[in-house]
Each structure stands twice: as C-alpha cells, then as structure tokens.
Amino acid sequence: MKAPVRVTVTGAAGQISYSLLFRIAAGDMLGKDQPVILQLLEITPALKALQGVAMELDDCAFPLLAGIVTTDDPSVAFKDSDYALLVGARPRGPGMERKDLLAANAAIFSVQGKAINDHASKNIKVLVVGNPANTNALIAQRNAPDISPRQFTAMTRLDHNRALSQLATKTGTSINNITKALIWGNHSSTQYPDLHNTLVDGKPALSLVDQAWYESDYIPTVQQRGAAIIAARGASSAASAANAAINHIRDWALGTPANDWVSMGVYSDGSYGIEKGLIYSFPCVCKNGDWEIVQGLDINEFSRAKMTATEKELQEERDAVKELLPA
C-alpha cells in the first residue's frame, strides 16, 4: 500500500463537501490503492456540524481513510497538504453587488493562498470550486508566490460534463462515444461551450446537429445550467459539482484518456491570444501529474468573439479586486 497523501477540503461541512468527502475516502479520486488523510477546514460556527461529518466518515470504515483532521485554522488545514479542494466560498446574499461578492471572496482566498504558500507541500495541486472560481483561484495563486502558478486550477469540469450530457441527449448516443468537448473561459454564463472539435462516434459533432440548435439552444443551455438547477432544486448544484471536482483531480493526478482532452481553468501562458496570467478554461491533457494546454486548434470568427467576451469578464473580475492582489 502507498503512503497516505493529505487532502485538504475547505467548506467541509457544506453541501458540496457532503457529496465529495465520502467519495474521496472511498478512493474515487486518487485510486483504490491510495490512502488519504482528510484535512477539513470550516468557519468556527460550522465546526460542530463538521464534527458530525467526521463521525460519519469514521462510521463508513473506509480502508483508505488513514486519518481526519477538523479545524478552523488554515495553517493546520493546509499543513503538508498534497491536494487542496477549495470548496468554501461566500455565497451571494440579497442585494449584494457582484463587486461585493468578489471582495468578500478575495479576503477568504488571499488568506488560504498564504496558508498554502507557508504550510502546504510545494508540489500541492489546488482546485478552486467555490465561486467565482476562476478569480478566486487567481487570488489564491497570487498570494502563494513560492508555489508554481501551474498548481492552481479552477473547476470548469462541471460545465464540460454538462456539455457532454446535452450533446449525448441530442444525438442519442452514449457519453462514452463523445470526445473533445470543450469549455473556454470563465465558469460563468459567459463561458463558451465549443463543439468545433468535438467528435461523436468519431464524426464531427457539428455535422450531426444544426447550427441553429448549437447557437441558440446548446450554448445557452450549458451556460445557464447552474441557474436552471437552482430554479428546479431550490439550491445550487452539489452532487454534480462534487463529481466534477473528483473528475478534475483524478485526471490531473492519474492522466487523461488517449485521444481526448478535458476542460480545466488554468494559468494562461498566452495560448490562443488569451492574456497571460488569467485563470482561463482551456482544453488540457494531463500526464505524470501535470497538465498542458492543447495547441493548434483552429479558431474561427464565431469562436474568437465568444472567447474574447469571456476573457473580458475575467479581466473585469481581476480589476475589481486589483488592490487585494499582491504585485
């Protein structure tokens, strides 16, 4: 059996984490031969509820669960951490402007970025789930100068999975037969679900669906799926978000399938003309615990306009919290 790895989860008593932690402990994220120590962070008022979650984890008697730490102290939660899933974030309250939400989360993620910098393994892999995920990831990354910016990612895998599901339903095929689905940009309603390179049973997806459906049905459905779930369920996506987080880390740690890619919010190196330093969703392949952006895709005018629109939103979000970002 391998030595245990330390997995930090923030917002650990929340809805997403309740769907996430048991699957991590069962080996769904890092494999059935990888023991884990869960290091669970919550705000002080939620520590009692977190204790209850820890009791339930104990009661599952998971063979791979080598230990549990519960704390409200980031320096304890991130100590020697190998993986961190930053799930906890300030939700948008009534009458709250977007810039207020950005500022409230900037305070949270700057503290966590510093704690990661000072206490975590230098090889840590960080996934930000809490929204606004891309900009929260940027804030954490900028507050961790001793950690490579490549180690901070944001989750667009839920959007990617939604895109797969919508296309599978439309074409009457199994999700297993679809490759190269793609989300560009921000995890928000400006994201661009791009089918120009997607294959269904090896055939170009856009040869199987009409352009009108693609532009006026598929794209807005994927963009607005989160809001549709809130309207239906009375609460935001939790189990599907947890599932996507597991998919994201598993592929990053263990590798993506041959002849396919995944969508990941990663540090832009200027690929496809996207401003360097933004956390932007690109097509990525992973192997040996590292990711790289797929290069050489043709970008037509339609795609370029959509990619630029979501880039602009990310620039605006960054500029709104500029004074909170270290130089």
UniProtKB/Swiss-Prot annotation:
InterPro entries, A to Z: L-lactate/malate_DH, Lactate/malate_DH_C, Lactate/malate_DH_N, Lactate_DH/Glyco_Ohase_4_C, Malate_DH_AS, Malate_DH_type2, NAD(P)-bd_dom_sf
Record: residues binding NAD(+): G11, A12, A13, G14, Q15, I16, S17, N105, Q112, V129, G130, N131
Reaction catalysis annotation: (S)-malate + NAD(+) = oxaloacetate + NADH + H(+)
Coiled-coil stretches noted in the UniProt entry, renumbered to this chain: none
Active site: H187
Oxidoreductase found in the keyword field: yes
Keyword line: NAD, Oxidoreductase, Tricarboxylic acid cycle
UniProt-listed Enzyme Commission number(s): 1.1.1.37
Xref: Pfam families: Ldh_1_C, Ldh_1_N
Molecular function terms, GO-annotated: L-malate dehydrogenase (NAD+) activity
Binding sites annotated in the UniProt record for substrate: R92, R98, N131, R162
UniProt GO BP: malate metabolic process; tricarboxylic acid cycle
Presence of keyword Ion transport: no
HAMAP family per the UniProt record, alphabetical: Malate_dehydrog_2
Database matches in PANTHER family: MALATE DEHYDROGENASE
Job of this protein: Catalyzes the reversible oxidation of malate to oxaloacetate.
Protein name per the record: Malate dehydrogenase
Lineage of the species this protein comes from: Bacteria, Pseudomonadati, Pseudomonadota, Gammaproteobacteria, Cellvibrionales
